[in-house]
Design a protein with these regions (language model features):
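A composition/biophysics-driven feature that prefers long, compositionally simple stretches
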Residues: 1-105
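Structured loop/turn residues at beta-strand edges in well-structured enzyme cores
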Residues: 13, 43, 108, 167, ...
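A broad detector of the eukaryotic-type serine/threonine protein kinase catalytic domain
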Residues: 23, 53, 82-85, 111-115, ...
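Short catalytic-site patches enriched in acidic/histidine residues
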Residues: 81-85, 90, 121-188
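Active-site pocket-lining segments that scaffold enzyme catalytic pockets across diverse folds
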Residues: 103-113, 123, 131
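Contiguous, non-catalytic segments that form substrate-binding/exosite surfaces or channel walls
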Residues: 118
């Protein structure tokens, strides 16, 4: 169940039953379609597990979620975090190859850091050039670049890069979450 803008993309995957609605719809932004789908697939006494743990997100307004729960009752939405985590731990050979390809992109970009990071180069410029290197090495997109630099170490890695130029003795740290073919790498 997705907004209609994703129909073409989802049509290329292995899922054959893709249901869509015209979004955005301020009156019913897919909630009735999702409720109808769930009630058609899950028996009235059934439970629907969704991830509720770390790194999970509710991608709908909370009011819509509460409305969905009412519409699908007596079915219950329960915490399926453990089950989802167990499934995610198991990777096919194809997934492993995709993860390796994503990591290879980051590895190649890190190998290029000496091309653009050096004494006198502002940290903000290093960040931008690093993102460019990731894209040039094959990333489809760069979800984030974080890092820091400072004499003998760095103070934090969550502040935005600034225009302070790198100096001799600075330790530079870069962290990225580049994506290739839908697979992320987390590389420091």
């Amino acid at each position: 169940v997705i907004p209609s803008i994703g129909t073409e993309l989802m049509g290329r995957c292995w899922i054959s039953d893709v249901r869509t609605w015209n979004a955005p719809d301020p009156v019913d932004d897919g909630v009735s379609l999702l409720a109808d789908t769930l009630t058609g697939l899950v028996p009235a006494s059934g439970r629907i597990g969704i991830p509720m743990g770390l790194e999970s997100h509710l991608r709908m307004p909370v009011a819509d979620f509460h409305g969905l729960q009412k519409r699908i009752a007596p079915r219950q939405i329960v915490d399926g975090t453990d089950a989802v985590y167990r499934v995610r731990e198991i990777k096919s050979e194809a997934e492993i190859a995709k993860i390796r390809a994503s990591c290879a992109v980051a590895d190649a970009a890190f190998d290029r850091v000496p091309e653009f990071a050096g004494q006198g180069v502002p940290l903000a410029r290093v960040f931008r050039d690093f993102q460019v290197a990731l894209l040039q090495e094959g990333a489809d997109w760069v979800s984030y670049v974080a890092g820091g630099a400072g004499p003998g170490g760095y103070g934090d890695v969550i502040s935005p890069a600034d225009e302070r130029p790198l100096q001799t003795g600075d330790v530079l740290m870069l962290d990225t979450g580049a994506v290739r073919d839908g697979y992320f790498c987390d590389f420091d």
